[in-house]
From Swiss-Prot:
Belongs to the calflagin family. One of its GO terms (molecular function) is calcium ion binding. This is Flagellar calcium-binding protein TB-1.7G. Ca(2+) 3 binds at residues 176, 178, 180, 187. Residues 1-25, 202-229 are annotated as: Disordered. This protein has four EF-hand domains, three of which may be functional calcium-binding sites. InterPro entries: Calflagin-bd, EF-hand-dom_pair, EF_Hand_1_Ca_BS, EF_hand_dom, FCABP_EF-hand. Residues 44-79, 80-115, 126-161, 163-198 form the EF-hand domain. One of its GO terms (cellular component) is motile cilium. It comes from Trypanosoma brucei brucei. It holds the Pfam family EF-hand_7. May contribute to the rapid motility of the trypanosomes, playing a role either in flagellar structure or in calcium metabolism. Could alternate between a GDP-bound inactive form to a calcium/GTP-bound active form. SUPFAM superfamilies: EF-hand. The keyword Nucleotidyltransferase does not apply.
Amino acid sequence: GSKNASNPKDGAASKGGKDGKTTADRKVAWERIRCAIPRDKDAESKSRRIELFKQFDTNGTGKLGFREVLDGCYGILKLDEFTTHLPDIVQRAFDKAKDLGNKVKGVGEEDLVEFLEFRLMLCYIYDIFELTVMFDTMDKDGSLLLELQEFKEALPKLKEWGVDITDATTVFNEIDTNGSGVVTFDEFSCWAVTKKLQVCGDPDDEENGANEGDGANAGDGVPAAEGSA
């Protein structure tokens, strides 16, 4: 897509200039944030996630509304150090996690995220941030746009991230939804996050003192990220 193709509201985590944060700003923030988001499925991460959920759940209902999630992302995780588009990113993550969680359970609370979906939401936010760092690395000329050659050179990194591509040109053209010959961050992130969640995303399966213990046990979740992408 062209520079004009991306929706300003969806400019989540665009590069310096569009986002108001520079590549250097994001790199520094990412080193802290990647450790602050407890998205893994080991015992320590589960314990941290339970505690974080309780901190987010200011009303003590065992369910999080969007405002509670956004407030927690600002006040507790301080994710705004990475991007000036945090509300857009959190809204996407909130909706995605809620929808996927409801699909797994067969039921779900409308406009609320329960503990079962909490890990999904954290994974989605983490993935968007990780994608931004990756896009910074792939976009070698700093044009805010990804060209086919840059995309081809990044295939090994994409494979590490969980997306194995055999026909780079065909996939690139699929991502380039308006056929402009270049890919914006929004086009790239929408494609890549969907691919990654299909491969790796799954809800939490532990109980947190409520009634969430019937969650899916679909796998071990998102693999360890490449730190500097």
